[in-house]
Structure formats: structure tokens, C-alpha cells
Amino acid sequence: MSETATWQPSASIPNLLKRAAIMTEIRRFFADRGVLEVETPCMSQATVTDIHLVPFETRFVGPGHSQGMNLWLMTSPEYHMKRLLVAGCGPIFQLCRSFRNEEMGRHHNPEFTMLEWYRPHYDMYRLMNEVDDLLQQVLDCAPAESLSYQQAFQRYLEIDPLSADKAQLREAAAKLDLSNVADEEEDRDTLLQLLFTFGVEPNIGKEKPTFVYHFPASQASLAQISTEDHRVAERFEVYYKGIELANGFHELTDAREQEQRFEQDNRKRAARGLPQHPIDHNLIEALKVGMPDCSGVALGVDRLVMLALGAERLSDVIAFSVDRA
């Protein structure tokens, strides 16, 4: 394929046929388990507050909004799906487009396909088992292994991430030749993420998928704090062959705590000179009504297909990557 022929698909037709078969297989997986497929908006008047996510913003100027109404493309369908859970829909899944105004590269495209699902009355471990079932079915891989965030740091960096101070984290970063970044960083969680990215991720999931669970409580996001160890959150991530595939939570159901976390995110944004984002008060109001205890996970479908096909880049399994869109 000529590099100048940008009208052509970035993926081959055989790869697109295989991708379609995988999408059918995913839907069958959930249909067989009685999980309802849903569709939620791609745009919202509110967005994520996470300091590490950059959403796309647009403006609606239709009838009744001559002054314009700010809308955000969804980075994930999470907030709307949780409102459906509160409304009583039961277990649900969604295959949808998500958007993040971030990097483009081998494993990234600003527009991508997300698989997200929620299981009322599942704890984190039961959902991890279901994710493992899906990966084995789609990838024909071995059963996954699991280790805690603390175990991962102790095994590969010889440091305890739950007790180490910033000086110790910078010392660990120096061993990875990351002092030029770490020495200027004051946020402890950013230091931990730096160490995880460069010191842990390259070592896990080489032969089989690997679940890393019980992230620090300070990185809980929308997950519950463990009742057994308040230092950690009921959150997990899945890695395979150098790729982060999924991020899951035992979901937070406390409306007040969730609102406080959103507000804390915005304070962190302000401290970093980042724009503060509108909080999704519809989600907060729904949580006040009461969301069933549940666990949920978001999985990158393009990355899953890339692994299933043995492709080198996301663009090999997407009809038109952003540079050809």
C-alpha cells in the first residue's frame, strides 16, 4: 500500500473481516451470560475530572441554544451506564466509540472502541475471572496470573509502594535512569505511575495475561477502598504482551464520597494549571438514589483485536486511523 494513498483503509480487508468476527464473538459471549447490550450518548454536558485524561470539547448551537452549549465527547460510557444500573437494568455491556484528546501511536488512537460492562453483586475477583474467561475465548491464551500492586513493586523494583516516601521513590526512579523526570515531580502518585510504567509493565504479561490489583487508595478513581486494607482500592488492570488491556473497579456507590473525589481532582487540575472540568451531577444524583453493589470494567477492543491478530499497530486493525480519517 502506497504511503501517499491516504484514501485507502489503514487496515487490510482480511483484518477487518477478522475484527468483525471478534465483535460478533464478544456479543455472543455476553448474550450467553444474559448480559444486556445498551447504547448511551457519545456526548455529555459533563466530563471526567481525572487529571490524566484529556477529553474533546465541542459546542451545540441548535434551536434553543443560540448562545451555544458546551458538550464533551465521552472518554468512556461509565457515567451513563451507572445511571442505567440505578434505574434497574441489571447486568449490562456496551461496545462503543470513546474519545481522548491525547497521543496517537502504536497503541493509541484518539477515537477508539471500548467494551465496558457492569455486573451487579459481583466483587472485584469474580469480575476478574469473567475478564479472564473472555480473554481466553478471544485470544486463545493461557489463564491469567494475578499479583497485587504491592507484590509487583516488591518483585520488580524491590520497594513497597504503600509505605515508601517520595525520596525512596526517586531513588528507585534513579535506578531506571528516570531522575530527570522524577527529581522534578512532587506528586507521589505520579512518581508511582512513572515507576509502574517503566519498572513494572515491561516485566508482566509476557506469556499470559496478568492482573494487577489493589492499587493504592490514592489512585482509587471510581473504585471502593478495600475494607480489609484501607491503603488500597478495589481496582485492577490487565496487561498482556506489553499492552494495557483493561481497567476495572469494585464500583464506588457512595454519592458524597464520589463528589468529593471529583472535587479533589479539580483541585489537582487547578494546582497543575489545567482547566477544571464540569462534574457530572446527574451521576451524583443517581448515586444518591442508590446504585447496586457492583463491579465494572473497561477494555480496549482495538488492542484486543490487535493481539488476537498478531498485528503490530492499532492502525492495522482500524478501518481508518486518525491520520487517514
UniProtKB/Swiss-Prot annotation:
Annotated ATP binding sites: 100-102, 109, 244-245, 300
PROSITE patterns for this protein: AA_TRNA_LIGASE_II (PS50862)
Highest taxon of source: Bacteria
EC class: ligase
Assigned EC number: 6.3.2.-
Bridged cysteine pairs (disulfide): none
Keyword list, A-Z: ATP-binding, Ligase, Nucleotide-binding
Subunit structure: Homodimer.
Name of protein: Elongation factor P--(R)-beta-lysine ligase
